[in-house]
Amino acid sequence: MTDKLTSLRQITTVVADTGDIAAMKLYQPQDATTNPSIILNAAQIPEYRKLIDEAIAWAREQSSDHAQQIVDATDKLAVNIGLEILKLIPGRISTEVDARLSYDTVASVAKAKRLIKLYNEAGISNDRILIKLASTWQGIRAAEQLEKEGINCNLTLLFSFAQARACAEAGVFLISPFVGRILDWYKANGDQKEFAPSEDPGVVSVTEIYQYYKKHGYKTVVMGASFRNLGEIIELAGCDRLTIAPSLLKELAESEGPVERKLAYTGEIQAKPAPLTEAEFYWQHNQDPMAVDKLADGIRKFAIDQGKLEKMISDLL
């Protein structure tokens, strides 16, 4: 009998949410996603030590200023890890812009171009890279500009419908709505502690976004992310892409049986509404206390891990 991972692959593009080379070799995903937390964890893997040493040596050649060396080395390390992953996957690697730039459009664009330049210099073309940006108004504007310049983006930390709508209207390549973190918030802040997969607030959110995009003919790819259990993944089968951590990829591979398509849009394509203004975006996003909390919390957590990574690099310089 076919395992659930193989069955899921027939209807959804499976992406690995990890920087672990061993997991890539084992589960053979189409694409891979990284973030500051994943890069920090990957930096602890012994096989990656040479990538850290190379990044530090390179940074020393670029500048004699210690602070600049830290920035250069962390950028180079993220790209070095991405390059290793690209050897093992046929598709794209997502590399994230520093979360501390989440409210700065100009700086986000500059950092994105810096990362792209490092990939290009290593022989990797833009069509194998996605630049990850937080789905703030400023991050979405940065992505809009980058897309026009041929740099595809993955808009992450997406929790509200307003964020999803603004991303589609900006013409971004892909969004990563966070399923599990939405569930976490409702469990922590509501009376209900258990949800059937079809009623899981994260699943409901991604389903609504998927249907809206397809109904209005938006090309933006919907990639569900941040899963807490197998039920969430199975309930979103048919989503354009799903990025899944190795522990859940393992569970899928070890579970037998078919996976049925749950997401599909069969209706007619309808006219797109007028794009959200900045004021409308903030007002609508602000009406969702979960999204406000989780976006801010996600940016803070990624920034903390970026700081830890820089401290590790600084100590080695």
Curated annotation (Swiss-Prot):
Enzyme Commission code(s) on record: 2.2.1.2
Residue pairs linked by disulfide bridges in the UniProt entry: none
Pathway listed: Carbohydrate degradation; pentose phosphate pathway; D-glyceraldehyde 3-phosphate and beta-D-fructose 6-phosphate from D-ribose 5-phosphate and D-xylulose 5-phosphate (non-oxidative stage): step 2/3
A single cellular component GO annotation: cytosol
Main location: cytoplasm
A GO MF label: transaldolase activity
GO biological process: carbohydrate metabolic process; pentose-phosphate shunt, non-oxidative branch
UniProt subcellular location: Cytoplasm
Listed transmembrane segments: none
Active-site feature positions: K132 (schiff-base intermediate with substrate)
PROSITE patterns: TRANSALDOLASE_1, TRANSALDOLASE_2
Gene3D superfamilies reported for this sequence: Aldolase class I
Reactions catalysed: D-sedoheptulose 7-phosphate + D-glyceraldehyde 3-phosphate = D-erythrose 4-phosphate + beta-D-fructose 6-phosphate
Keywords from the named record: Cytoplasm, Pentose shunt, Schiff base, Transferase
Similarity field: Belongs to the transaldolase family. Type 1 subfamily.
Family annotation (NCBIfam families): PRK12346.1, talAB
Subunit structure: Homodimer.
Function: Transaldolase is important for the balance of metabolites in the pentose-phosphate pathway.
Protein name: Transaldolase
Annotated organism of origin: Yersinia pestis
